[in-house]
């Protein structure tokens, strides 16, 4: 009883202190166009109830404010969507503006302070320590494992797509990418593709991403303390336990392998010393003259389990979906496979052959333009920043709009047209196309992700003809059948047409389709 009384008495004081600190920011950011909201909620009530509605609202605001930076308020938290390439260049190249936004604090119970969420000197030291794990030579070693996992994936697809069945390609891809990150960077085999019915961690990844995204746009749920009293907390706690148990099991298995191998030989050039997986690197590393503790190892392994699995799922799934809608581009990919591999299309493509597939590279680039795996990147201003005359006030959330760049007709001509050759004929500026971010906090695993993407798509087009869920959905004009990036009126027109198999895009940390990505394989 007294606890409740104390809380009720403290709330007005806390609100006064909070508003005293936060209200001046509204004046500091006035030069940026903004959408008026209501007291206490700001624009939170306008954002929508689902991740898909939130993404659509961002695009509607972007069109409303002439495709430039704009500001919204979530409660009294200032949020600026940055879509100006000149501003993005300054922000991404900054060596001081590298703090991730405060929303990432909600990831700490799960990921701790790994590369995704850490800041300052810890981030710099850990980034330097982990970088060798994704060295060019190690990627070549990983490639054969990627081929083996792709073969298992193809076998699974043959089974579920038999009889012209419509399959959810997005759902199937989750298990492929989980196997890939475990078998390569983690050095642990879990056989998720073959044992999918017993792998509950995939659902846990999906649930946690959804939970974090919804909390971000509900001001009261941002507080860990208040969130404990929400009806969703029980699901969150169960999901968190599943994810943490899975990561700790991965670490325990690799510790056993690490100790056994180290006991057999410590000779330079041995298989063990030459081919270290991420957990091995962490177990052997020192920071400031000391070994990493158990929590630090957990943080980096859990971070790479999430980023290496979830972002690549998005990339592979949307690339497969695009194949189903664009038969001409699929034909060009197949012809390139023949040109590079000759008549031996049933064997694995080598690392060198994948590297020689230039149209495949263009296809992946264009797929990442229209469906970037990470649609937004967050930064947090720890002081006032003057960026080309625009003040970004201290304590502001910056949402770097990777996805909106791809639909900006000032950067890409006919942005709703899927046209891989655009990257051959007119290359965008270095900060007009940034699907893997740029600058000091760029994606450390981008070469790994691209190699996996190319390996899977190469094998897919050599094995199947990829078809849409229904024949009518083949693109006849080269344009994407998607609502994202469209002005409100055009989006509503397409919705009335009722294409139930068109993706309903949502930004749940990574890009997903709420209704799956459906296609057929023949």
UniProtKB/Swiss-Prot annotation:
Entry cofactors: heme
Intracellular or extracellular location(s): Mitochondrion
Class of this enzyme: oxidoreductase
Keywords: Heme, Iron, Metal-binding, Mitochondrion, Monooxygenase, Oxidoreductase, Transit peptide
E.C. number: 1.14.-.-
GO-annotated molecular function: heme binding; iron ion binding; monooxygenase activity; oxidoreductase activity, acting on paired donors, with incorporation or reduction of molecular oxygen
Residues the entry annotates as binding heme: 307, 443
GO cellular component assignments: mitochondrion
Top-level division of the source organism's lineage: Eukaryota
Gene3D superfamilies (alphabetical): Cytochrome P450
Similarity comment text for this entry: Belongs to the cytochrome P450 family.
PANTHER family cross-referenced by the UniProt entry: CYTOCHROME P450 4D1-RELATED, CYTOCHROME P450 FAMILY 4
Function: Probably involved in steroid hormones biosynthesis.
Protein's UniProt name: Cytochrome P450 4e5, mitochondrial
Gene transcribed to yield this protein: Cyp4e5
């Amino acid at each position: 009883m007294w606890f409740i009384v104390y809380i009720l008495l403290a709330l007005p004081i806390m609100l006064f202190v909070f508003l005293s600190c936060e209200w001046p920011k509204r004046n500091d950011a006035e030069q940026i166009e903004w959408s008026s909201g209501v007291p206490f909620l700001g624009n939170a009530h306008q954002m929508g109830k689902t991740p898909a509605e939130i993404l659509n609202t961002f695009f509607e605001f972007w069109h409303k404010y002439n495709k430039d930076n704009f500001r919204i308020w979530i409660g009294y938290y200032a949020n600026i969507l940055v879509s100006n390439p000149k501003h993005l260049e300054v922000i991404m190249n900054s060596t001081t503006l590298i703090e991730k936004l405060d929303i990432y604090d909600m990831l700490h119970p799960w990921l701790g302070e790994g590369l995704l969420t850490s800041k300052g000197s810890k981030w710099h030291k850990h980034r330097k320590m982990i970088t060798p794990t994704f060295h060019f030579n190690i990627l070549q070693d990983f490639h054969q494992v990627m081929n083996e996992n792709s073969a298992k994936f193809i076998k699974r697809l043959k089974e579920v797509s038999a009889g012209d069945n419509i399959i959810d390609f997005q759902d199937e891809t989750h298990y492929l990418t989980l196997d890939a990150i475990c078998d390569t960077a983690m050095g642990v085999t879990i056989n998720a593709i073959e044992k999918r019915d017993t792998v509950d961690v995939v659902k846990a990844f999906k649930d946690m991403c959804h939970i974090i995204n919804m909390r971000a746009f509900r001001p009261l749920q941002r507080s860990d303390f208040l969130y404990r009293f929400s009806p969703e907390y029980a699901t969150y706690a169960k999901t968190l336990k599943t994810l943490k148990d899975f990561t700790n099991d991965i670490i325990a298995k690799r510790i056993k392998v690490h100790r056994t191998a180290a006991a057999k030989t410590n000779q330079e050039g041995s298989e063990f010393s030459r081919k270290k997986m991420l957990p091995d690197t962490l177990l052997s590393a020192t920071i400031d003259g000391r070994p990493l503790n158990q929590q630090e190892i957990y943080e980096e392994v859990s971070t790479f389990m999430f980023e290496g699995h979830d972002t690549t799922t998005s990339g592979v799934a949307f690339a497969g979906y695009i194949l189903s809608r664009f038969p001409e581009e699929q034909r060009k990919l197949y012809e390139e496979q023949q040109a590079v591999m000759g008549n031996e299309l049933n064997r694995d493509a080598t690392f060198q052959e994948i590297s020689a597939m230039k149209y495949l590279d263009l296809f992946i680039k264009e797929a990442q333009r229209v469906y970037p795996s990470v649609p937004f990147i967050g930064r947090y201003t720890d002081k006032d920043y003057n960026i080309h005359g625009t003040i970004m006030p201290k304590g502001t959330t910056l949402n770097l709009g990777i996805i909106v760049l791809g639909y900006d007709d000032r950067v890409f001509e006919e942005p709703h047209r899927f046209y891989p050759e655009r990257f051959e004929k007119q290359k965008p500026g270095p900060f007009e196309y940034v699907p893997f971010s740029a600058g000091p906090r760029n994606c450390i695993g981008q070469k790994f992700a691209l190699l996996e993407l190319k390996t899977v798509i190469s094998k897919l087009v050599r094995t199947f003809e990829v078809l849409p869920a229904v024949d009518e959905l083949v693109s006849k004009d080269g344009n994407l059948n998607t609502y994202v990036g469209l002005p409100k009126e055009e989006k509503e027109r397409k919705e009335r047409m009722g294409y139930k198999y068109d993706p309903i895009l949502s930004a749940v940390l990574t890009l997903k389709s709420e209704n799956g990505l459906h296609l057929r394989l023949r």
